[in-house]
């Protein structure tokens, strides 16, 4: 893998890990990037009570994912680590046969196998599917679209804290969070859910408190020409002072 492709894959892992952290919050208490295993097949791992509860591999391609590749990746991922749940995060487009294979696995779990599914699963041991769950997440290859998906997930997260942030503010927090996840992969220790939430909430409240516009209500009262002692009836606000140094449109 070349330098450009490696950097892009590293970035995609950051996006995928943030999405996992934001959308799968009810299960994990620790998230790992580049989780160490004997065959290095686990890109992201979710942990709970010192056990891996979800093992994730992230793949990306500018071309298309084939069924044969997906079968190999699943076998290797399952063989590399024992977990109750596995996930292939595919960033890019899938061939028709790959989509059929993905749907066939879902039919296997739902006990709704038909002739198409049986044919698609031929050559792949369904014993690998028993007593565990295999999921697929398919995301677009375009970084701009991934950024939007992360922003939307973060927006939903922020809404639970009753904060109102602008598009630019959410984008800033999203980028910083992805960057944090990428840096954490170099440490190998993982990130506690408590710390993840605390750091994210700290950013949210800091941005909301320091950089959110504040609305101030101003009441305007009119008086007839020649009225005196206005100060007894209201408090006068000098707009000249407020707009000092600013250019106003002619006629105002």
Predicted region positions:
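Acidic metal-coordinating catalytic centers involved in nucleic-acid phosphodiester chemistry
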Residues: 1-6, 60-252
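Catalytic centers of nucleases
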Residues: 6-7, 11-75
């Amino acid at each position: 893998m070349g330098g450009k492709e490696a950097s892009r894959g590293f970035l995609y892992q950051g996006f995928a890990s943030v999405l996992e952290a934001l959308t799968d919050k009810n299960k994990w208490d620790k998230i790992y990037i580049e989780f160490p295993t004997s065959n290095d097949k686990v890109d992201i791992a979710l942990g709970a009570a010192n056990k891996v509860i979800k093992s994730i591999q992230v793949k990306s391609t500018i071309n298309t994912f084939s069924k044969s590749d997906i079968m190999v990746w699943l076998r290797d991922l399952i063989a590399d680590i024992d977990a109750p749940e596995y996930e292939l995060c595919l960033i890019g487009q899938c061939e028709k046969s790959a989509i059929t294979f993905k749907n066939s696995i879902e039919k296997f779990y739902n006990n709704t196998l038909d002739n198409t599914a049986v044919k698609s699963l031929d050559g792949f041991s369904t014993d690998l599917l028993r007593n565990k769950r295999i999921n697929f997440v398919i995301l677009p290859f375009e970084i701009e679209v991934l950024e939007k998906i992360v922003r939307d997930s973060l927006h939903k997260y922020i809404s639970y804290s009753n904060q109102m942030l602008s598009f630019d503010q959410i984008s800033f927090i999203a980028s910083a969070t992805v960057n944090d996840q990428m840096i954490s992969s170099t440490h190998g220790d993982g990130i506690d859910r408590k710390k993840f939430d605390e750091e994210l909430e700290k950013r949210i409240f800091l941005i909301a408190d320091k950089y959110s516009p504040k609305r101030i209500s101003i009441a305007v009262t009119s008086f007839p020409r020649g009225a005196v002692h206005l100060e007894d009836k209201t408090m006068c606000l000098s707009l000249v002072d407020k707009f000092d140094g600013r250019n106003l449109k002619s006629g105002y």
